[in-house]
Swiss-Prot record:
Protein's UniProt name: 2-methyl-aconitate isomerase
UniProt keyword Isomerase, yes or no: yes
InterPro entries in the cross-refs: PrpF, PrpF-like
Coiled coil: none
Active site: 107, 321
Nucleotide-binding among keywords: no
Binding positions for substrate per the UniProt entry: 22, 69-73, 109, 281, 312, 317, 322
Self-association and partners: Homodimer.
Molecular function GO terms recorded: intramolecular oxidoreductase activity, transposing C=C bonds
GO BP, one annotated term: propionate catabolic process, 2-methylcitrate cycle
Summary of the function given for this chain in its UniProt record: Involved in the catabolism of short chain fatty acids (SCFA) via the 2-methylcitrate cycle II (propionate degradation route). PrpF catalyzes the cis-trans isomerization of 2-methyl-aconitate through a base-catalyzed proton abstraction coupled with a rotation about C2-C3 bond of 2-methyl-aconitate.
Entry EC no(s): 5.3.3.-
Length: 397
């Protein structure tokens, strides 16, 4: 046994929450150690240690992470610095096996838990919380500079978490939380340019050594590259193991994603994609087909408008990222995109798409002015609940 003295662990107030089909560790900014209250290496080091990364075993045994992109997540919330907003929401996607936290995008699934956490942790004026009803929480999504509105159910003055709303990819029902992503498309002066960074609804994406692909590259909710499943040799009915057990396929998707990121202006050199795993996402789409979901439940072709499979952090997602669902709903609403064409074409205000765990309905209000498409908002329902609250402990730096 070593005689060396080691400092004790520190404890930080935290809440472990499920939001949509993801889980993450939530913090109030004021509860973080002083050095971690500002962006930088101290904050990243703390969050990496909380989650249990980097882990060469890719299991995150020594932390709160669950060794998947859906469960290697952190959230920092504070009173909003923006007028007409309640809370600032900052999301950090923690790499599982590498020492970095990706701050380049939002997590749409955990967005469902932001309002509930803010209400329960004193970030919302108590006078605004009804005894019974719905509390509207205006969220400033600090990663992407966008407004999100969460409608959180309240019973007896507290967040209502239990209910009968069922979400494919989540085993148990809970209370429904409606979320509005306001003006979700990228601004002209934002990173990656406007909603369609290339100016086209469909581009030909040249990927050396792999091929040429028709692609819709959109920045709404989260930057996303959509490709036809057929062009990749898939049907759109694939489940996680079909893709994630194929290292060659994963490498191909990552190469396509990197070239798409370059084409979208998100990176300046192809090598930068390796340290920007959270964005852009890559997904493939197909017309409706019947298939068995990962739970064994049959998804009938007539029950969906299209099929979508998406990768997150280098792996096929078990359901669908909430931000990617915003991109799907937005692209579906705009005639001529690959997503819209897979859903049958024409003008659409909402679609129900099939994903590996089942189906999800998402709506978007899109308008065309002077030949340019804009999206007023995208809407979907998720659920959220507290799994554990108290303190997380980490070794003192």
């Amino acid at each position: 046994m070593s005689n060396k003295l080691f400092p004790p662990q520190i404890k930080v107030a935290a809440t472990y929450m499920r939001g949509g089909t993801s889980k993450g560790v939530f913090f109030r900014l004021q509860d973080l150690p002083e050095a971690a209250q500002v962006p930088g290496p101290a904050r990243d080091a703390l969050l990496l240690r909380v989650i249990g990364s980097p882990d060469p075993y890719a299991k995150q045994i020594d932390g709160m992470g669950g060794a998947t992109s859906s469960t290697s997540k952190t959230v920092i919330l504070s009173h909003s610095s923006k007028a007409n907003h309640d809370v600032d929401y900052l999301f950090g996607q923690v790499s599982i096996d590498k020492p970095f936290v990706d701050w380049s995008g939002n997590c749409g699934n955990l967005t469902a838990a932001v309002g509930a956490f803010a209400i329960s942790n004193g970030l919302i004026d108590a006078a605004r919380i009804p005894r019974n009803g719905v509390c509207t929480v205006r969220i400033w999504q600090a990663n992407i500079g966008k407004t999100i509105i969460a409608h959180v159910p309240i019973t007896d003055g507290a967040v209502q978490e239990t209910g009968d709303f069922e979400l494919d990819g989540v085993t148990f029902p809970a209370a429904e939380v409606q979320i509005e992503f306001m003006n979700p498309a990228a601004d002209d002066d934002g990173e990656g340019g406007c909603m369609f960074p290339t100016g086209n609804l469909v581009d030909v994406l040249e990927v050396p050594g792999i091929g040429r692909f028709n692609a819709t590259m959109i920045n709404a909710g989260i930057p996303t590259i959509f490709i036809n499943a057929e062009d990749l040799g898939y049907t759109g009915t694939e489940l996680q193991d079909d893709i994630n057990s194929d290292n060659a396929a994963l490498a191909k998707f990552e190469t396509i994603r990197a070239h798409g990121a370059l084409r979208m202006g998100l990176i300046k050199h192809i090598d930068e994609a390796a340290s920007r795993q959270h964005t852009p996402k890559i997904a493939f789409v197909a017309p409706p087909k019947s298939y068995a979901s990962s739970s064994g439940k049959t998804v009938a072709a007539e029950d969906v408008d299209l099929l979508v499979r998406a990768l997150s952090m280098g792996k096929l997602h078990h359901a669908m990222m909430g931000t990617a669902a915003v991109a799907i709903g937005t692209a579906a609403a705009i005639p001529g995109t690959l997503v819209n064409l897979a859903a049958g074409g024409g003008e659409k205000e909402a679609v129900r798409f099939g994903h590996p765990s089942g189906t999800l309905r998402v709506g978007a209000q899109a308008v065309q002015e002077n030949g340019e498409w804009t999206v007023i908002k995208a809407i979907m329902s998720r659920s959220a609940r507290v799994l554990m609250e108290g303190f997380v402990r980490v070794p003192k730096p």
